[in-house]
UniProtKB/Swiss-Prot annotation:
Pfam families, sorted: Ribosomal_L20 (PF00453)
Keyword rRNA-binding: yes
Keywords linked to the UniProt accession: Ribonucleoprotein, Ribosomal protein, RNA-binding, rRNA-binding
Record keyword Ribosomal protein present: yes
UniProt GO molecular function: rRNA binding; structural constituent of ribosome
Region forming the signal peptide: none
Function description: Binds directly to 23S ribosomal RNA and is necessary for the in vitro assembly process of the 50S ribosomal subunit. It is not involved in the protein synthesizing functions of that subunit.
Chain's gene name: rplT
GO cellular component: ribonucleoprotein complex; ribosome
HAMAP family: Ribosomal_bL20 (MF_00382)
The protein's name in its UniProt record: Large ribosomal subunit protein bL20
Length: 118
């Protein structure tokens, strides 16, 4: 049976990992064994954080809506409840944008929510 020389394949695999680790600090970008672990861990963090990003943005939107709603004399939960009763179907992302960039429109939404609750 002929001998299999895998130097080309190994070199390509190592180059691929070291390319992915470019920009990492110290040995993490130069030593294959360390770089491999760093790339694997980076992938795990990226996977986890893609899911966490969605939660974090929702938290941010809710915090912004709550702050704007309280400036208009209503709590977040009552505001959302009022919008549901008034059958206003605007998601939290858009509500947060309105709260930040268009105060008058947000005040109108608050009045609509208050009217639906009364």
């Amino acid at each position: 049976m002929a001998r299999v020389k895998r130097g080309v394949v190994a070199r390509a695999r190592h180059k691929k990992i070291l390319k992915q680790a470019k920009g990492y600090y110290g040995a993490r970008s130069r030593v294959y064994r360390v770089a491999f672990q760093a790339v694997i861990k980076a992938g795990q963090y990226a996977y986890r954080d893609r899911r966490q990003r969605k939660r974090q943005f929702r938290q941010l939107w809710i915090a912004r809506i709550n702050a704007a709603a309280r400036q208009n004399g209503i709590s977040y939960s009552k505001f959302i409840n009022g919008l549901k009763k008034a059958s206003v179907e605007i998601d939290r992302k858009i509500l947060a944008d309105i709260a930040v960039f268009d105060k008058l429109a947000f005040t109108a939404l608050v009045e609509k929510a208050k009217a639906a609750l009364a």
